[in-house]
């Protein structure tokens, strides 16, 4: 029984030694809660870069949406003008029979 407990303790110590040899750490003391002088500057800067990218994407989406709305309005106006001209051509034909479109097709 003592032998198995001794082996278990030695195994635990061996695991701790191997685990600690594979990792490393550094403690940096500073006056306040800000990151120390050896902190990763890229990590602090990347959040600002992401915010700028998101602003650009948002502005681009807004511009595309505005242009699509403008294009839709132009298409609707052109369709309305086309329908009005077809109505006028039907009235000029007397309204009897089939409607004639501006290109002469039925």
Curated annotation (Swiss-Prot):
Entry-annotated residues carrying Alanine amide: 35
GO biological process, one term: neuropeptide signaling pathway
Signal peptide limits: 1-25
Family: Belongs to the AKH/HRTH/RPCH family.
Localization in the cell: Secreted
UniProt keywords, alphabetically: Amidation, Cleavage on pair of basic residues, Hormone, Neuropeptide, Pyrrolidone carboxylic acid, Secreted, Signal
Sites bearing Pyrrolidone carboxylic acid, chain numbering: 26
Pfam families: Adipokin_hormo (PF06377)
Site residues by UniProt (Cleavage by prohormone convertase): 38-39
Biological role: Neuropeptide with neuromodulator or neurotransmitter role that activates the adipokinetic hormone/corazonin-related peptide receptor (ACPR). May function in regulation of post-ecdysis activities. Does not activate the A.gambiae adipokinetic hormone (AKH) and corazonin (CRZ) receptors.
Tissue: Only expressed in the head and thorax body segments of adults. Is more expressed in adult males than in females.
Coarse class of the protein's main subcellular location: secreted
Protein name per its UniProtKB record: Adipokinetic hormone/corazonin-related peptide
UniProt superkingdom: Eukaryota
Propeptide segments, given as residue ranges: 39-106
Any one Gene Ontology molecular-function term assigned to this protein's record: hormone activity
Keyword flag Secreted: yes
GO cellular component, one term: extracellular region
């Amino acid at each position: 029984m003592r032998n198995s407990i001794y082996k278990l303790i030695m195994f635990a110590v061996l695991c701790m030694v191997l685990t600690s040899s594979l990792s490393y750490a550094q403690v940096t003391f500073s006056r306040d809660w800000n990151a120390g002088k050896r902190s990763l500057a890229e990590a602090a800067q990347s959040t600002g870069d992401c915010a700028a990218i998101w602003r650009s994407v948002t502005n681009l989406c807004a511009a595309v949406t505005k242009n699509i709305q403008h294009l839709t309005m132009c298409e609707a106006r052109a369709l309305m003008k086309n329908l009005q001209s077809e109505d006028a051509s039907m009235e000029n034909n007397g309204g009897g029979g089939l409607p004639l479109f501006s290109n002469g097709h039925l």
